């Protein structure tokens, strides 16, 4: 059917199949407005397994063809449901702390902790992206991109302009550094992890990495305060 052909076309274009099955060919990711409304409601109110991850993916979705109003309707229902409950948003946002405290990454950069590579996605990229996503959900921001969400959150006073700029610059730096590391691993025919060994970075790169992780640390403090994560 068309869903199968669409997925096959993506493969031909060079997009690998999603290991998690988040694809059009998967019936769990298709449905009517009513079906989707029930699905996202269950993800939010009765989270189990990968429910919150699926909810995060849905919040980043945007229409590329067809009637965009259908997606907008489901998203509006979700925003209405979520913003009526602070505990629900706090539970969703708690994932920013899933990979340990920033202190661990700082110790590695300063040579005070265990040696070894730093997982940039866990240390900085995910906390920025998901933290901004969570604040956007709390403030009913309809934008789906992190940069657009930061801009909207700064505009409505939710996020300090200086911190917003630092987060955006830090995100771009971390993503670039991770891409560079991944390409280097690929060139050496190693498994691509995108992890970075601080000892192999230049002095400038180490300083920029420290700045980025410092912004992440301060952003997490903002999230804990605004979304009351410490009382969940």
Where are these regions (language model features)?
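A nucleotide- and high-energy phosphate-metabolite-utilizing enzyme signature
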Residues: 1-232
């Amino acid at each position: 059917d068309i869903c199968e052909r669409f997925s096959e076309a993506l493969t031909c274009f060079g997009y690998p199949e999603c290991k998690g099955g988040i694809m059009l060919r998967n019936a769990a990711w298709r449905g009517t407005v009513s079906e989707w409304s029930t699905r996202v409601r269950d993800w939010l109110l009765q989270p189990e397994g990968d429910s919150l991850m699926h909810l995060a993916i849905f919040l980043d979705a945007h229409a590329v063809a067809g009637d965009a109003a259908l997606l907008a309707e489901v998203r509006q229902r979700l925003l209405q449901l979520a913003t009526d409950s602070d505990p629900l948003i706090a539970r969703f946002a708690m994932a920013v702390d899933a990979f340990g405290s920033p202190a661990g990454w700082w110790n590695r950069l300063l040579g005070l902790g265990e040696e070894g590579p730093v997982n940039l996605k866990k240390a900085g990229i995910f906390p920025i992206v998901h933290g901004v996503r969570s604040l956007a959900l709390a403030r009913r921001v309809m934008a789906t991109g992190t940069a657009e969400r930061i801009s909207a959150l700064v505009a409505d006073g939710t996020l300090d302009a200086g911190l917003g700029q630092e987060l955006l610059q830090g995100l771009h730096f971390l993503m670039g550094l991770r891409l560079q590391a991944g390409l280097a691993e690929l060139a050496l025919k190693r498994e691509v992890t995108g992890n970075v060994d601080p000892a192999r970075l230049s002095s400038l790169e180490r300083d920029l990495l420290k700045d980025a992780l410092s912004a992440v640390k301060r952003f997490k403090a903002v999230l804990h305060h605004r979304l009351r994560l410490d009382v969940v």
